[in-house]
């Protein structure tokens, strides 16, 4: 259960609401500054965010990310779970995986839009950068991604399959119109998770297909270790910054993983399978 994770000045109004039984602190739009460690941060207003001309997200995305005041990347849309901000806060405190610094997150009560105000990452996403990379550079970046996944998988287990603070999954595999908690979790074990995935598929697929799939699931999807998982490792969610060259003259990079909306504890195969599907089986 997160507490008052944002330390604010006395003029900032605070409002605690409930989202899936977890208390989040909403910093309302009237907040002008926040204090993080010894840093006083002047936040952009909603008006400044909505007027931002530099759009960082893809044109067809329902969620918008903009560059504001040189310092901030702001993600906003209806339906973004505030837990995405909590995930990044959690990872910054509990792992060595590089993630954007989160300054604040809130819901605008007038529009019901979620806003996550983060640091702006200087660099390019891997989707944009990939065509210009040399084979040796691709190998270096692949190793960095692998190392990040290994670090994620070393995060302590909470004793369930689900997201931070014993909350349900946000992956579309578990989506139902009524947000059925029996389908979205959290789950006690992989067997329960498998049953609920098949139950979810029953809503859209033919029974013959489910029967065939049941046999495959029973014979393969068991005894996997639960590990912390990003869940959406598309190339566009891997930011790459060039660093100073190594002593041997070879190029050096660092990667920052973004878009932590569906992260949580999943069976160990989940990261690979989701990344493969997201990349549409492209060799690179």
What are these regions (language model features)?
Residues 138, 145, 151-231, 241-253:
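An alpha-helical support segment within catalytic cores of ATP-dependent transferases
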Residues 51, 57-59, 219-224:
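A recurrent flexible, glycine/aromatic-enriched loop bordering the glycosyltransferase active site
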Residues 120, 231-233, 260:
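Residues immediately flanking
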Residues 2-55:
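Juxta-kinase regulatory segment immediately upstream of eukaryotic protein kinase catalytic domains
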Residues 236-237:
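Conserved protein-kinase catalytic-loop position immediately C-terminal to the HRD catalytic Asp
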Residues 106-109, 240-244:
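Short, low-complexity Ser/Thr-rich regulatory SLiMs
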Residues 227-228, 241-284:
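Active-site Asp-x-Gly
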Residues 54-181:
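ATP-binding pocket architecture of kinase catalytic cores
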């Amino acid at each position: 259960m997160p507490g008052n994770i944002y330390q604010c000045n006395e003029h900032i109004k605070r409002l605690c609401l409930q989202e899936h039984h977890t208390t989040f602190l909403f910093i309302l739009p009237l907040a002008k500054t926040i204090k993080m460690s010894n840093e006083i941060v002047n936040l952009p207003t909603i008006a400044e965010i909505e007027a931002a001309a530099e759009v960082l997200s893809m044109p067809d995305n329902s969620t918008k990310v903009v560059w504001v005041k040189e310092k901030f990347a702001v993600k906003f849309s209806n339906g973004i779970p505030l837990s995405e901000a909590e995930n990044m806060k959690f990872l910054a405190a509990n792992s060595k995986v590089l993630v954007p610094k989160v300054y604040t997150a809130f819901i605008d009560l007038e529009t019901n839009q979620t806003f996550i105000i983060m640091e702006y990452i200087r660099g390019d996403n891997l989707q944009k950068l990939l065509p210009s990379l040399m084979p040796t550079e691709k190998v270096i970046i692949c190793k960095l991604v692998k190392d990040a996944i290994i670090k994620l998988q070393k995060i302590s287990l909470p004793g369930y399959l689900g997201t931070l603070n014993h909350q349900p999954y946000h992956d579309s595999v578990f989506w139902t119109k009524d947000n059925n908690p029996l389908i979205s979790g959290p789950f006690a074990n992989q067997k329960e998770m498998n049953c609920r995935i098949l139950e979810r598929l029953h809503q859209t697929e033919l029974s013959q297909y489910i029967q065939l799939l049941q046999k495959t699931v029973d014979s393969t999807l068991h005894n996997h270790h639960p590990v912390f998982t990003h869940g959406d490792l598309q190339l566009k969610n891997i930011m790459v910054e060039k660093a100073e060259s190594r002593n041997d003259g070879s190029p050096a990079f660092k990667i920052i993983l973004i878009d932590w909306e569906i992260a949580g504890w999943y069976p160990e195969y989940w990261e690979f399978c989701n990344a493969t599907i997201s990349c549409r089986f492209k060799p690179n």
